[in-house]
């Protein structure tokens, strides 16, 4: 089964747990740019940056293992962790949800007066998967998506909304917007003969070429499903951890 969602949601989490219990194999594709995903899930960004299976092997980076210049130190005060160059703080180290593990989620680098000028994001496999460059107002103007070798693969020029894919052979490709990028990726990942389960009705448009018999839709409630019924063969309801089929 091939599952398409806009993002990782509670409903998707519940569905995955249910399929795991049944021993039902599945793959998940989320149409956002998340880079911290499990081995069964792919996104618009990881489609380009984590093609090598080795990319999804590893464990979260322990904070003391951060690569920093010689003589720099990683200091911790309670749950606050930062990089210190011997004279001043150079970055905040934000830890992953499991605080006691002391593993890195992101590093917020300082410019002058401890204003954050860039952010490095680390995934669950222990390597830097994204870098965001920030304006003086603290907004990202360029998001850089990296592979495990730390090569810049996909660039997102945030204010323009454009994407630049950089390939090893130098055949770079420009995408005018996220919708164009999404269309190009889904053309490659949508299976020919596998059942497709949609988690967001906004995604119905991207699979309109697929036979209705191969499409299903997963909803969190039974409201406003009449139009969707005409486009898919089955509708599944995920309600408070229960999964049932709606005829």
Question: What name fits each language-model region?
Answer:
Residues 1-67, 148-247:
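Long terminal segments
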Residues 70-181:
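Repetitive, compositionally biased segments used for assembly/scaffolding
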């Amino acid at each position: 089964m091939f599952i398409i969602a806009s993002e990782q949601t509670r409903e998707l989490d519940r569905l995955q747990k249910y399929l795991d219990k049944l021993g039902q194999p599945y793959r998940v594709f989320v149409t956002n740019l998340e880079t911290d995903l499990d081995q069964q899930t792919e996104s618009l960004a990881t489609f380009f940056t984590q093609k090598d299976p080795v990319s999804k092997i590893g464990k979260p980076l322990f904070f003391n293992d951060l690569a920093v210049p010689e003589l720099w130190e990683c200091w911790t005060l309670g749950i606050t962790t930062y990089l210190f160059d011997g004279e001043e703080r150079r970055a905040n180290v934000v830890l992953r949800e499991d605080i006691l593990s002391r593993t890195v989620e992101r590093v917020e680098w300082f410019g002058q007066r401890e204003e954050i000028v860039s952010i490095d994001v680390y995934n669950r496999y222990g390597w830097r998967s994204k870098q965001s460059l920030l304006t003086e107002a603290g907004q990202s103007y360029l998001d850089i998506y990296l592979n495990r070798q730390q090569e810049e693969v996909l660039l997102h020029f945030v204010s323009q909304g454009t994407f630049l894919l950089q390939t090893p052979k130098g055949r770079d490709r420009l995408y005018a917007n996220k919708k164009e990028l999404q269309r190009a990726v889904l053309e490659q990942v949508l299976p020919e003969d596998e059942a497709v389960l949609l988690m967001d009705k906004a995604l119905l448009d991207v699979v309109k070429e697929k036979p209705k018999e191969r499409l299903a839709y997963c909803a969190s409630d039974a409201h406003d499903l009449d139009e969707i019924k005409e486009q898919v063969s089955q509708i599944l309801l995920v309600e408070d951890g229960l999964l049932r089929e709606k005829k």
